[in-house]
C-alpha cells in the first residue's frame, strides 16, 4: 500500500454522443485491449437496440436504472483474526457500487446466448432494469453472503 496518501479521483470525459460520464465509464469498462472504438460501437449499438425494443423508454435512463438495480449495498471482505479467516460484511461506497454494477452487467452480457455483443448487452440491461438476469443474481448472491456472515460484522475495520 502506498504511504503517499490518497490519490485524487480521476475524472472521465463525458461520452461524445450523449454527454454522460456514466456512459463514458461504461464504454471504458466494455473496452478490451485498448480498442475504444469497438467498445463505443458495442455500447451505442446496445442503446440503439434498447430504443428499438422499447420505443417509449429513454436508453440512458434505462441504463441508469439497470445500474441502480444491480449496484450492491453490502459485500464481504476477508479478514484474518487469530489464524481464522472471516468473511466480514462491509458497506460498499458509491464509486465501487457503480464499478461493480458495470462489471457484473458486462460479465453477464458476455455469457448470454444472443449472437452479437450489442444484443447481449441490450438484453442484459433490459433484464437488469426489470430486476432479473445474471447481474441481478450476482447482486442477490453477494447480499446473501453478507447476510449469512452478519455475525462477523463486529470485525469491521
From Swiss-Prot:
A Pfam family it matches: Ribosomal_S7
Swiss-Prot/TrEMBL GO biological process terms: translation
Alphabetical UniProt keywords: Ribonucleoprotein, Ribosomal protein, RNA-binding, rRNA-binding, tRNA-binding
CDD domains (alphabetical): uS7_Bacteria
PROSITE patterns xrefs: RIBOSOMAL_S7 (PS00052)
Function: One of the primary rRNA binding proteins, it binds directly to 16S rRNA where it nucleates assembly of the head domain of the 30S subunit. Is located at the subunit interface close to the decoding center, probably blocks exit of the E-site tRNA.
Family to which this protein belongs: Belongs to the universal ribosomal protein uS7 family.
Record protein name field: Small ribosomal subunit protein uS7
Source organism per UniProt: Stenotrophomonas maltophilia (strain K279a)
Gene coding for it: rpsG
